[in-house]
UniProtKB/Swiss-Prot annotation:
The lineage of its organism: Bacteria, Bacillati, Bacillota, Bacilli, Lactobacillales. It comes from Lactococcus lactis subsp. lactis (strain IL1403) (Streptococcus lactis). GO terms for biological process: valyl-tRNA aminoacylation. Keywords: Aminoacyl-tRNA synthetase, ATP-binding, Coiled coil, Cytoplasm, Ligase, Nucleotide-binding, Protein biosynthesis. ATP binds at K523. Its EC number is 6.1.1.9. This is Valine--tRNA ligase. ValRS has two distinct active sites: one for aminoacylation and one for editing. The misactivated threonine is translocated from the active site to the editing site. It holds the Pfam family tRNA-synt_1. Belongs to the class-I aminoacyl-tRNA synthetase family. ValS type 1 subfamily. A motif ('HIGH' region) lies at residues 46-56. Monomer.
Amino acid sequence: MTNELTPKFNPTEVEAGRYEKWLEADVFKPSGNPDAEPYSIVIPPPNVTGKLHLGHAWDTTLQDIIIRQKRMQGFDTLWLPGMDHAGIATQAKVAARLAEDGILPQDLGREKFLDKVWEWKDEYATTIKEQWGKMGISVDYSRERFTLDEGLSQAVRKVFVQLYNKGWIYRGEKLINWDPKAMTALSDIEVIHKEIDGAFYHITYQIEGSDEFVEIATTRPETFLGDTAVIVNEKDERYKHLVGKNVILPIINRVIPILTDDHADMEKGTGVVKITPAHDPNDFEVAMRHDLPMINMMNNDGTINENGGKYEGLDRFEARKQIVADLKELGQLVDIKPVRHEVGHSERTGVVVEPRLSTQWFVKMDELAKNAIANQTTEDAVEFYPPRFNDTFMQWMENVHDWVISRQLWWGHQIPAWYNEAGEMYVGEEAPEGEGWTQDEDVLDTWFSSALWPFSTMGWPDENSADFIRYFPTSTLVTGYDIIFFWVSRMIFQSLEFTGKSPFHNVLIHGLIRDEEGRKMSKSLGNGIDPMDVIEKYGADALRWFLSNGSAPGQDVRFSYDKMDAAWNFINKIWNVSRYILMNAEDISADAVSSALTKVANKTAGNVTDRWILTRLNDTVERVTEQMDKFEFGVAGHILYNFIWDEFANWYLELTKEVMFGEDEAEKDITRAVLLHVLDQVLRLLHPIMPFFTEEIFEKLPNTSGSIVVAEYPKVRPEFNDDKASEGVAMLIELITAVRNIRAEVNTPLSKAVPMLIKSEHADFLNAVSPYISRFTNPSELTIAKDLAVPEQAMSAVITGAELYLPLAGLINIEEEIARLEKELAKWQKELDLVNKKLGNERFVANAKAEVVQKEKDKLADYQEKFDTVKARIAELKEN
C-alpha cells in the first residue's frame, strides 16, 4: 500500500468502498470484552415511508459520533439499528401508489393489500440502509430489528394483555380525534393545531310554542345536526324564563331542551351554547353531566350520515355550505363574522380532524404517568440534555390524558382481542381455542410498539436474553424535541412498568434543520434538501462536520452551502497537511516515533516548539473529551478546528521548517516523529465526526496499524506538558503576529528588512528562539535585551512579557502612531472592564472553580501590564 495521498482531496474516491470494508471487518459489532463497560444506543427507527431527509442525517450523525468515540475509548459498544412500520403513514403511501393504477385497498382485501405494503417496506428498507451506508453509520446489522418482527410482536401482545388484565387498557365509547381521510382515530398529540381563516355563524333557534328565538354562534354550523340541547348559565337573568323549555332545531325540526350549566359563559357571545355531544369534547362533558343523548351525524369518511336528513351523503364542508344557504333562506342565519382561529389537522394526512364519538381502545395514563414522574426524583432518573427538556417531559406527564391506541388500519399490530357471536370478548397473547372467534380488525397505534423499542429489541420479554442482560438499560437516546411527547415519554413509562428501569440513562435532544432563512424545511415551501445530493457534491465527512459543528443540544441548525464549502475546505486543509507530513516522514516506524517522543518528554531531544505543540495537543484532548462527554459537539468541533488550523497547521508546521530545512538529521527525526504523532492524534479525535477521510489517512501513517475505527481514543499524557514551553511559544507567536500587523499598517512588506528591538524580562528565551523570529519577521538587525533605549520614531506593540519596537523613521507619522496606540489603549481598557466586572461578581467568585477564578485574575494582571505600557508609550511620544 502506498503511503502517498492524492494531490487533491476527492471525497468520492476516498469514500468509495470504505463502508463495505468496515462491514467485512466486523468492526461495528460489540467487542465482546466482558471486562469492558457496555455502552448501547438503539437507533430511533426511521419510518419505512420513503427516503431519509436531512433531519435523519443529523440524528444518525450525532449517534454515530457518540458510539464511535465510545468504541475507541474501549467501551463494549452496541448501536442497534432498525425501522418502524409507521402504520398510518405507510398505509397512506401504499394506498396512494395503488390509486395511481385506479386500485383501492378494499379492491384487494386485507391480506393482498398487506402483501403490497410488505413489498413497499422491503423496497424502502433497502434504500434506507444504502443511505445509512453513505452516511457511514457504524451500526451492528446482525441485530437489525423491525417493529413488526415476530419477537417485537410478541412483546407488543404481552404488554397489551398485561395492561388489560390490570385494568389499564379498556375499550369504550369516547370522544376522539377522527381523521376522515385515513378513516382512523388519532391521539391528541397526532393532531396539529393550525391557525386558519374561518367564520362565526350566528344562527337562531326558535323556542317551542313561542315566537321567541335564541341566538347561538358556531364555527361548524353543520354540527347542529347532532345537537341534543342548548345551555345557559343559571346566573344569566336574560334567559331564566327559558330554562326548562325547548327549542326547535331549524330544518330538521328536532326538539331539544334548554338547560343550565356552568360551561355557558355569560360574557362570551350571546351566552347561549349549542351542545353537540358526539362532536365536541366540552359538549361531551356537558352531556355526561346531564345524561343527554349523543347523536353521531358523520360517517367515517367525513360525509353526513342518516342522522343528517336531507344532507345525508354530502361531504362535511359541502354540507356546511348547503346548511348555511338553507338557514339564510329561512331567515335564521343572523350574521357571519370572519375569525382567525386554531383548527386541529391530522399530523399524517393534513386534513381537518373531526372530534367524533367512537368505540376505541384506550390506555389509562394516571398510574403510568405517576410512576414516570416519581422516577425522575430517583437515581434512575433520565438525564435530559439540555436540562430544560426535563421540564417539558414533566409538564406533559402531569397533564396527560388517556391514550387512544386503536387505529382503523390494516398495517400494524392487530389488537389481540377476539369476539364471538354470543357477545363475549377474549383478550390474550394467542387466539382462543375453539371456533366462532373473530379477531378485532383494528391495529395498535404505531407509537404503542415504538414505546417498547429499547427493551423489545434486546430480547424482552425474555429477561434472560444475553443482550437484555448486557445492554439494557441503554446508555443514550438521541432524538428531536418534536417527539418528546410521541415517543420519549412513552418509552419511559412503558419501560418502568415492564422492566422496572428507565430505558436509557441520557436523552440528547436536538432541534430541527432549517433553511438559510430559518424556515422549517417542507414540501410545500420546496426548500427540502436531500442529504444524498449534499454527499455527492461534498462527501459525507463534510456533511457530518457541518451537522456536528453547528450543533448544540436542543438548538435548531440552519443549513448553508457556504458552511458546506467551509467544511470541505477544512478537510482539504487537513488533507494537504497530512500529505506534507507523509512526504517528509514516510519511513519512520512506530517504535522510532515512541522513542523520539520519550526523548522530547525527558527534554533530552527536541526543541521548545515540539514541547509546545505536545502541550497544546494535551489541552485539546482534555477539552474536546470534556465537551464530547457533555454532547457539546459544536464546542468540541471549534476547539479541534482552532487547534488543527491555527496551532498545528499555521504555526507548528511552519515553525518546523526551521528544522526541516536545516542540516541536523537527528533533530529532523524528532520533528518528523512529533509531526506524525500529532497528526495521528488529530485523526483519532476527528474520526468519530468524520470517519471516511480519517481512515484513509490513518492507514497510510507509517506508525499505525489496523483500522482507526477500533484505535484507542487520545488521552492526556502528562509527561508531555511543559508550561514554560507553552508560555514561551505563545509569546513568540504573539510577537510575530504583532510585527506582521505593524508592517501591514505602514505598508512595509515582509521582504523589506527593517530593524527590530525587543525589550523583555524573557530576553534569554527570545534570544534562544531568535532564528524563528528572524525567519518570520525578516529584521535587518535584531536586538533583544532586558533593558534598552527606546527609539523616538518607532512603531511599538505590547505583548505578553515583552515590548516590541520597529524604528521606521520616515515611514511613520507620530500623530498617527499616537492615534493607533490610543485605539490599542481603549482595547485593553475594555478587556480590563470585562475582567473587573466578572471578578466583582460575588456569585461568580463564590461558585466558579478556583482555577477559573485564578485564570481571570491572571488575565487582569496581564491586561493591566499591557494597558500601563501602552499608556506610558503614548506619553513618551507626546513629550517628544
